[in-house]
């Protein structure tokens, strides 16, 4: 029997990077997996990479209407869940003098509001003994210039992990957070011009005690540990950052 045989999983933000790597490991282990994303191209590439066993659904993690529809779809596909991995998120770097209300709202809508309502709408589907894993960020513990709104939104999400863990204990659902440091995903190149992205990569390597970027697979292994192995752990945050937040 495969390690995750019979497990039913939804990954919010699962069409690239850390979410996609987690989906691959779960599918390889025999799980049934539904992943979401916004980009048509990303959805198509994810379906191709994950294969026909994966359910790939267009859904905007900021939209409560989309989340309602996704919960209905999940109920129809799986009936119940063993893991909800809330991974959708994005950073807009904005120094203090350039922050606008639109940037503030975008960062909190995607990185805090969306995850909170995702858990609210999916909690009734999660089996006793099931798990929620939220993706926070090293930006919620490290003061980084230009990250005021993103870091604050991720800090709010970290707080949600604690509170939701307390609220869902009666249902025997654990809630934890995985906290990535610099991870080698396309997000840097999407957020910055090529030259700036290269400079950021080099600068971050210098800050990380282990002197390298992490991989999506390293995040995926941490997520699966929290989801299925850490059965006496809830409300916790697991840094996967090469020691940056600790040393």
Give residue spans per PLM region:
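Short, small/polar-rich loop/turn modules that mediate ligand/substrate recognition or access, typified
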Residues: 169, 174, 234-235
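Substrate-binding pocket helix/loop in short-chain dehydrogenase/reductase
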Residues: 95-96, 100-108, 204
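C-terminal substrate-recognition "lid" of short-chain dehydrogenase/reductases
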Residues: 125, 212-240
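Alpha-helical segment proximal to the catalytic Tyr-Lys
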Residues: 124-125, 166-170
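Residue(s) in the substrate-gating loop at a strand-loop-helix junction
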Residues: 137
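Active-site helix of classical SDR
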Residues: 119, 153, 161
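Conserved glycine-rich cofactor-binding loop
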Residues: 15-16
């Amino acid at each position: 029997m495969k390690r995750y045989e019979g497990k039913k999983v939804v990954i919010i933000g699962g069409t690239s990077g850390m979410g996609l790597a987690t989906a691959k490991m779960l599918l390889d282990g025999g799980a049934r997996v539904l992943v979401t994303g916004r980009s048509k191209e990303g959805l198509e590439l994810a379906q191709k990479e994950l294969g026909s066993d994966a359910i790939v659904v267009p859904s905007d993690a900021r939209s409560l209407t989309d989340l309602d529809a996704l919960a209905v779809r999940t109920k129809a596909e799986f009936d119940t869940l063993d893991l909800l991995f809330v991974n959708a998120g994005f950073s807009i770097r904005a120094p203090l003098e350039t922050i606008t209300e639109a940037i503030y709202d975008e960062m909190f809508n995607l990185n805090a509001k969306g995850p909170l309502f995702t858990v609210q709408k999916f909690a009734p589907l999660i089996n006793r003994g099931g798990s929620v894993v939220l993706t926070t960020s090293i930006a919620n513990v490290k003061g980084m210039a230009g990250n005021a709104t993103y870091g604050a939104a991720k800090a709010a999400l970290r707080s949600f992990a604690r509170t939701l863990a307390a609220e869902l204990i009666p249902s025997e659902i654990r809630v934890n957070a995985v906290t990535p440091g610099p991870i080698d995903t396309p997000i840097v190149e999407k957020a910055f011009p090529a030259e700036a992205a290269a400079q950021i990569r080099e600068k971050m390597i210098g800050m990380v005690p282990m002197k390298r970027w992490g991989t999506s697979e390293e995040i995926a292994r941490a997520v699966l540990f929290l989801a299925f192995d850490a059965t006496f752990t809830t409300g916790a945050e697991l840094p996967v950052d090469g020691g940056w937040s600790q040393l």
